[in-house]
A protein has these predicted regions:
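Sec/Tat signal peptide C-region and signal peptidase I cleavage site
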Residues: 23-29
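Bacterial N-terminal signal peptides that target proteins for export
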Residues: 1-13
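Short, glycine-/small- and polar/acidic-enriched structural segments
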Residues: 30-167, 173-176, 182-185, 192-198, ...
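Sec-exported extracytoplasmic/periplasmic mature domains
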Residues: 55, 64, 106, 132, ...
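Conserved C-terminal helix/tail region of periplasmic/extracytoplasmic solute-binding proteins
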Residues: 305-339
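Bacterial N-terminal signal peptides
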Residues: 11-22
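Secondary-structure end/capping motifs
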Residues: 234-318
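Pocket-lining segment of extracytoplasmic ligand-binding domains
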Residues: 97, 180-271
């Protein structure tokens, strides 16, 4: 196995019913909130902290009744995400790529959402290629499959190619939403290389594709975050704090090597992968240099600035570039004691 496969970098929504809040750790004395958490992906390892929080009782301890609501009806992420945004009245908090909030003409245009905690710092994405492509130079004249033009995965792929001497136009970029459809393009022969997440990347490895680079090599980012509507957040701050405390406890649990076997069980539950594959996925999380999973949900403003700068570099955002505060609000993580 290519050792570079072990060098890498990992969303949902909520509706809560009002109630009187009590201090952390006193769930028996407080009224429970039903938290409807909508997701636009299936079997995604980004749900690891939430699953661990459920399995280990961290949501219960904080008085949270966690109920996922899935926006995956069509299997096409852009379509499902459009449906999600149109269903504003069915959720209050969301797990989403930070970049989605930044897109000037994106699906969240005109909304009032802000990130309050981090789900995944650097993305666990692999730039893979068929066996005859040994170096980036071999990509010249080939077709590379990536997400949308404004997706940070596409942008970091472009940055990686530029770092290795390729110019715009040297490689044809075919945009396909979703890692599994990109795997299909690779296996069909229509695409020579592409960027894939876990666990879809394993199907590419099984088909003979190999890793050219990990996207983290393009530099640190803040990839996936929990977002809330600012107006709703102003009147539900303690609910947000409880949620952050529960997922922060889960992240600390995941980082503790003594809990590996329990974390593997959670990963198997989410991804429906065999235990051996779940352990392989988690190996990327355990490699500190990849900085995939936050220590406890904290937001790295330096990484936010880097993500904004990446959007500026490729013309998605025009200057002067906005400050991080336009997209993130640290107050809730601070109140939860994780920031």
């Amino acid at each position: 196995m290519d050792t570079r496969r072990f060098r890498s970098a990992m969303v949902g929504l909520v509706v809560l019913a009002p109630a009187t809040l009590a201090p952390a750790g006193s769930a028996t004395a407080q009224q429970t909130y039903t938290l409807r958490y909508a997701v636009d992906t299936e079997r995604n390892i980004n749900g690891l902290a939430q699953t661990v929080a459920e399995r280990q009782g961290f949501f219960t301890r904080e008085g949270i009744n966690f109920q996922p609501v899935r926006f995956v009806a069509t299997g096409n992420r852009p379509t499902d995400r459009t449906a999600l945004v149109a269903s504003r009245d069915t959720f209050d908090m969301a797990r989403m790529q930070l970049s989605v909030l930044m897109e000037p003409e994106g699906r969240f245009k005109g909304t009032n959402y802000v990130a309050v905690s981090s789900v995944a710092n650097n993305p666990a994405y692999f730039l893979v290629a068929r066996p005859d492509i040994k170096t980036f130079a071999d990509l010249k004249g080939k077709t590379l499959t990536e997400p949308s033009p404004s997706d940070p995965i596409t942008l970091t792929a472009r940055k990686l190619m530029e770092t290795h001497g390729l110019k715009d136009g040297d490689v044809e970029i075919k945009t396909i939403a979703g890692s599994q459809p990109r795997v299909d393009c690779l296996k069909s022969g229509a695409c020579a290389a592409g960027s894939l997440s876990q666990p879809s990347v394993f199907a590419a490895f099984d088909a003979g594709f190999h890793t050219l680079a990990m996207h983290i090599e393009a530099g640190p980012l803040l990839y996936v975050v929990d977002i809330v509507d600012r107006s709703w957040a102003e009147t539900h701050s303690e609910v947000i704090v409880r949620y952050i405390r529960a997922t922060a406890a889960a992240m600390r649990f995941i980082h503790d090597p003594r809990n590996l076997d329990e974390v593997v069980k959670a990963a198997v539950e989410i991804t429906h992968q065999p235990e051996s594959r779940a352990r392989e996925m988690l190996s990327y999380f355990q490699d500190a240099k990849n900085d995939v999973l936050p220590k406890q949900g904290e937001i790295d403003t330096t990484a936010v600035k880097a993500t904004i700068a990446l959007f500026g570099q490729y013309g998605i955002l025009k200057g002067p570039l906005p400050p991080p505060e336009r997209f993130v609000d640290l107050r809730y993580a601070q109140m939860a004691g994780v920031q």
